[in-house]
Design a protein with these regions (language model features):
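Short loop/turn segments immediately following beta-strands, especially the blade-tip
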Residues: 64-73, 134, 206-207
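Single conserved hydrophobic/aromatic residue that forms the stacking wall/gate
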Residues: 1-12
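Loop-centered beta-sheet repeat module
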Residues: 14-68
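Short beta-strand elements that form the blades of beta-propeller/WD-repeat-like
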Residues: 6, 42-62, 101-120, 150-179, ...
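Conserved blade-ending motifs and adjacent loop-strand segments that build the rim/top face
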Residues: 73-97, 131-164, 178
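Beta-propeller blade signature
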Residues: 10-14, 124-133, 196-205
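C-terminal functional modules
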Residues: 171-206
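Internal helical hairpin/lid segments
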Residues: 97-147
Length: 207
């Protein structure tokens, strides 16, 4: 609602278009409700014209189209490694819960689905949609090699949109860049970076 005659607070009118049942895979423990926030933690991403989402303890990625129709498209089969909500409030327990699979951000290209953890389990998975193969990576190590000039490998943090949907990008801090220059003897920029310079953007194409 963008009627300019309305007050500023009414420029954008919020409205619930449709409600969906949660797909989280756990039972509430009423004894723990004073300690645990049971709100749904959801990862969203877009691919083509659809929205995809994955809930905290679910093992399924769902697709939502423009008609708000939801369909399961990927089942990850986490088995006994699905996180449980009680662990959400634990602090500094990454090693203890590392076996649990929790994705904090997802991205998809025409061929690949990238599933990445963060605080809980610092691992990542790459699913090849053509071959059906899934690769598991420890600690989100930099696994995309630079085949243009042989410089630093990188791990993407997001992808492009529209015609660039198969391009992924990452940021390299100035100190990381200079460490790479020292280690490889290659300096693609042709000059040294200082610690307070902006990070370098790396763009790669997944084929």
């Amino acid at each position: 609602d963008t009627d300019r005659s309305r007050g500023l607070g009414d420029v954008y009118k919020r409205q619930i278009l449709k409600r969906f049942s949660a797909t989280n895979n756990f039972d509430r423990d009423k004894r723990m409700e004073y300690l645990i926030s049971y709100h749904n933690e959801i990862c969203f991403y877009t691919y083509n014209d659809d929205v995809y989402f994955h809930e905290f303890t679910s093992d399924t990625i769902f697709r939502m189209n423009k008609r708000l129709e939801v369909k399961p498209v990927y089942v990850m089969g986490k088995g006994d490694k699905i996180p449980v909500p009680e662990l959400r409030n634990e602090i500094n327990q990454e090693a203890k819960f590392k076996k649990l699979i929790k994705f904090e951000y997802l991205m998809e290209t025409d061929r690949h689905l990238l599933m990445m953890g963060n605080r809980w389990n610092k691992s990542a998975y790459i699913y090849d949609k053509q071959t059906g193969e899934t690769i598991r990576l420890e600690d989100e190590q930099a696994v995309f090699t630079n085949d243009l000039n042989g410089f630093l490998p990188f791990w993407p943090i997001d992808r492009g949109r529209g015609e660039a949907k198969n391009e992924v990008w990452a940021l390299i801090r100035p100190d990381q860049y200079m460490e790479g220059v020292e280690a490889t003897g290659v300096n693609p920029l042709g000059f040294d970076l200082k610690f307070d310079d902006n990070p370098v953007i790396v763009i790669g194409t997944l084929k």
